[in-house]
Amino acid sequence: MRQQELIQKLLAGADLSAQEMEACIDSIMENRFTDAGTGAILALLQKKGVTPTEAIGAYENLMTRVTPITLPAHAVDTCGTGGDHRGTFNISTAAAFIAAGAGVPIAKHGNRSITSKCGSADVLEALGYRVDLPASATEEQFRETGFAFLFAPLYHPSMKAVASIRRELGIRTLFNLLGPLINPAKVKRQFIGVFDPSVMELYADVLIHAGCQHAMIVHGKTEHGDGLDEASVSGPTTIIELFEGRLCHHTVNPEDFGLNRWSIDELAGGDAETNAQIIRQILDGSATQAQIDAALFASAITCYVSGMGSCIDEGMSMSKESLESLAAMENMNRIIEVNNRLAEECNTHEG
């Protein structure tokens, strides 16, 4: 479909088929559309609202473009969509280290900050972790530690084609929507926090299409009723659970799992150094109880999604043991040590 034809169709409010969307993304990534045309298409899709069928078409095209990496499909990705503007610390990153300390294999896909002060890549770097390892070294990192961070720009080089257009538009687009769904390792277990509850069903549809085995898609509320892309310790959390092709809907509260309810202000983060310090304090037990509870809740869900915990309650027990035994802290230190060694080896080989 030609650029002008596509724009006219979207202006009329019409939806695209999966094949049309796949062809559209192909034309965008191969620079067959003008920058103005691509910007118009992305803005019109955002205004209309992306359908599950359109998201699946875009997903299919983007996954053909990833830099390949081979990690076990049973590894778990923990991530959020961002965009809630609540300024919390990096809860899903802290949770990933707690779950890893409990033996859960982690393949976390992430990026630098887009809508917050500090993205997962930023806080990992502040902890001393090198996010720029090539795929082969990242595979070795996972073999040695059961943990890998997949830095989005390294695995989605085709995104450079739209980087300046997205920056100039200054709005969330289809690419922000798909970010949490396009883990290059094609993991089959995911814990995803979304700030906009209207996309939860869409995420479930794409994950079913992708063959995801077990996923928890969550949307939390603060005590003021504002949305969070986290499991909330400040209010209720709505969950869509996907397990082997079947969907279940739940609403849970922190008290259901023995956690206290805290004000969202208690979970405030800052820049990368501040958030790295919060994560260290959570893992060594010196953080506030609010910070610990938020990380425990996310880790408990991660343990459950991994299949190592039979329910969130069991995941909570695993997570508390990981923290209280200092396994999470010791494991994080080892992960960073191995990561730094592999980075040095890469530098030596390049030199």
UniProtKB/Swiss-Prot annotation:
GO terms for molecular function: anthranilate phosphoribosyltransferase activity; magnesium ion binding. Mg(2+) 1 binds at S92, E230. 5-phospho-alpha-D-ribose 1-diphosphate binds at residues 80, 83-84, 88, 90-93, 108-116, 120. It catalyses: N-(5-phospho-beta-D-ribosyl)anthranilate + diphosphate = 5-phospho-alpha-D-ribose 1-diphosphate + anthranilate. The keyword Magnesium applies. Pathway: Amino-acid biosynthesis; L-tryptophan biosynthesis; L-tryptophan from chorismate: step 2/5. Its EC number is 2.4.2.18. It comes from the Bacteria. Binds 2 magnesium ions per monomer. Its cofactor is Mg(2+). It is an enzyme of class 2 (transferase). Keywords: Amino-acid biosynthesis, Aromatic amino acid biosynthesis, Glycosyltransferase, Magnesium, Metal-binding, Transferase, Tryptophan biosynthesis. Mg(2+) 2 binds at D229, E230. One of its GO terms (biological process) is L-tryptophan biosynthetic process. GO terms for cellular component: cytosol. Homodimer. Catalyzes the transfer of the phosphoribosyl group of 5-phosphorylribose-1-pyrophosphate (PRPP) to anthranilate to yield N-(5'-phosphoribosyl)-anthranilate (PRA). Belongs to the anthranilate phosphoribosyltransferase family. This is Anthranilate phosphoribosyltransferase. It comes from Chlorobaculum parvum (strain DSM 263 / NCIMB 8327) (Chlorobium vibrioforme subsp. thiosulfatophilum). The gene is trpD.
